[in-house]
């Protein structure tokens, strides 16, 4: 007699039960949940004397910026006119506001009121800029005019805040000279490379360090180099808050690396350069303790939303500076296409309950994503239109000029506006990017702090945001609440609002502790139940068949 299981109907039932068991036992990836932010005040880093975590050496030549035809350095920068800085000086010039610039250092210049704040690269004083980035950023914030405009009278007449604390002592001797290769790729905005567990294999070239000033666009004409103005000739470099004081803290550099550098990943040729998120955290605490009332961070780390690394120390440092020490923290949003940075979706029409589209974030920008404590800045062009390469994200608060940038050279001290080609056949690269947009907003924050010293840092940010020129939707992920308006921020009747952020409500993607082993009890119960049911069905079918066979 043929086996009952040889009947087609019973074979199908058995196969169906087997497939059900296999499907239930397969490991289907779970959906990624984005946890809400949390700040643990106990994790605020100690304010030790600035210095590197490990021995460092210079590995590249210093960058030497140049002057190109456009923008014309003999005229005021287009961004200066776009946001009407000269009129804002009628109400405030940032008198007495200490502005910390956490960047590549600032080279001293008679037109820049700068004090040393320390150096996390070589343990020096922070008054050295090998990357020609921090000096340009500081020029936008506080450079004194030369020739085209007169130096405005200090407003308010009395300095709003005490001068910053004295410089930190030097903790290490300068590094001995080392043989260096030919000129490095040009810098701004410096991107921090953080060593984290690698995410799933990225597309080719993802995560590689692109030129921080943005790759040249092959569709645009090359801007030819031109001779700079002679020393002492009038130029268009003018800071937003010329009576503010810059505190220079060198935290990042592409010209230095550890003496014993390590790769980012086991299969990566990318090396960890000078500057990490932890050193940003320490620099923020140090700047706040020196008395900075505005902290400009024009360095950006971009990380995948699925693997943002452990940033609890940075979050605690930002919380401390913003709430305990009352500092306005301004950060660059990042530039699309650079070192892992990419645009996030703008809006999900299927989810109107999430107008900033946090749930579709794919790449996060740090420290910008700590939006309870940081004012993140996107970039517009010389006409006020959003810059395509300005990284979008729900943390963007406002926008400011990010093209046609000029500043003071860290070498000769004169006006510069571009980097030379890093390789034969490449183009000159005019300064552009959200690094410089952040500098404009830091200058505006200094103006507001000087005029309204009674406002808290959070209230200053509120005034800047409330007075911005909104985009068509009121707010979006490219421009935030729109282009800053310094005159409106200084003159409009704007309610002060809450003294502090309502809590850690920003949707910062922070890594949780390592997850516990998967709990498969529910799955195992389901498998057992289905197996029992399937076994029962088969047994009943076989029993019925046997009874009929008798």
Give the ranges of each region predicted by the language model.
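Hydrolase catalytic cores
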Residues: 402-479
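Second-shell loop/turn segments in exported
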Residues: 122-128, 268-274, 302-308, 385, ...
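Active-site glycine-centered loops adjacent to acidic/histidine catalytic or metal-binding residues
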Residues: 103, 334, 433
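Active-site core segment of subtilase-fold serine proteases
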Residues: 39-40, 44-274, 289
């Amino acid at each position: 007699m043929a086996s009952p299981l040889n009947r087609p109907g019973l074979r199908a039932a058995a196969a169906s039960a087997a497939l059900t068991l296999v499907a239930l036992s397969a490991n289907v990836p779970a959906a990624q949940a984005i946890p809400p932010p949390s700040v643990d005040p106990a994790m605020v880093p100690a304010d030790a004397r600035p210095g590197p975590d490990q021995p460092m050496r210079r590995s590249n030549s210093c960058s030497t910026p140049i002057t190109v035809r456009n923008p014309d350095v003999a005229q005021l920068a287009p961004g200066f006119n776009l946001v009407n800085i000269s009129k804002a000086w009628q109400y405030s010039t940032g008198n007495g506001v200490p502005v910390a610039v956490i960047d590549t250092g600032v080279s001293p210049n008679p037109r820049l009121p700068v004090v040393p704040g320390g150096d996390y690269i070589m343990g020096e004083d922070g008054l050295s800029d090998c990357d020609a980035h921090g000096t340009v950023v500081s020029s936008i914030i506080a450079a004194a005019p030369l020739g085209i405009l007169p130096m405005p009278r200090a407003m308010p007449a009395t300095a709003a805040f005490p001068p910053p604390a004295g410089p930190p002592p030097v903790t290490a001797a300068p590094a001995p000279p080392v043989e260096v290769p030919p000129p490095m790729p040009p810098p701004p905005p410096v991107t921090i490379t953080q060593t984290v567990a690698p995410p799933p294999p990225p597309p080719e070239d993802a995560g590689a360090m692109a030129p921080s000033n943005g790759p040249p666009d092959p569709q645009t004409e090359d801007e030819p180099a031109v001779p700079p103005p002679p020393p002492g000739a009038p130029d268009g470099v003018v800071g937003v808050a010329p009576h503010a004081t810059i505190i220079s803290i060198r935290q990042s550099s592409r010209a230095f690396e550890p003496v014993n550098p390590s790769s980012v990943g086991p299969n990566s040729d990318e090396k960890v350069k000078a500057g990490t998120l932890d050193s940003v955290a320490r620099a923020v605490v140090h700047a706040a303790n020196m008395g900075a009332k505005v902290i400009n961070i024009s360095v950006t780390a971009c990380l995948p939303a699925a693997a943002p690394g452990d940033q609890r120390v940075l979050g605690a440092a930002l919380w401390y500076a913003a709430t305990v020490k009352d500092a306005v923290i301004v950060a660059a949003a990042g530039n699309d296409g650079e070192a892992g940075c990419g645009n996030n979706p703008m809006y999900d029409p299927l989810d109107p309950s999430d107008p900033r589209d946090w749930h579709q974030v794919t790449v996060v920008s740090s420290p910008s994503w700590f939006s309870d404590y940081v004012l993140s800045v996107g970039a517009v062009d010389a006409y006020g239109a959003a810059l395509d390469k300005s990284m979008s994200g729900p943390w963007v608060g406002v926008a400011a000029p990010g093209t046609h940038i000029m500043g003071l050279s860290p070498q000769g001290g004169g006006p510069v506006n571009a980097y030379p080609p890093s390789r034969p056949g490449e183009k000159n690269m005019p300064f552009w990017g959200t690094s410089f947009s952040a500098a404009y907003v830091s200058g505006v924050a200094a103006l507001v702090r000087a005029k309204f010293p009674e406002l808290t840092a959070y209230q200053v940010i509120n005034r800047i945001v409330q007075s911005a020129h909104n985009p068509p939707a009121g707010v979006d992920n490219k421009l935030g609440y729109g282009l800053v308006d310094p005159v409106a921020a200084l003159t409009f009747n704007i309610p002060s609002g809450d003294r502090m952020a309502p809590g850690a409500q920003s949707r910062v993607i922070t890594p949780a502790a390592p997850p516990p082993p998967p709990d498969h009890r529910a799955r195992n119960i389901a498998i057992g139940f289905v197996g029992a049911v399937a076994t029962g069905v088969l047994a009943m079918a076989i029993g019925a068949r046997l009874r009929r066979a008798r």
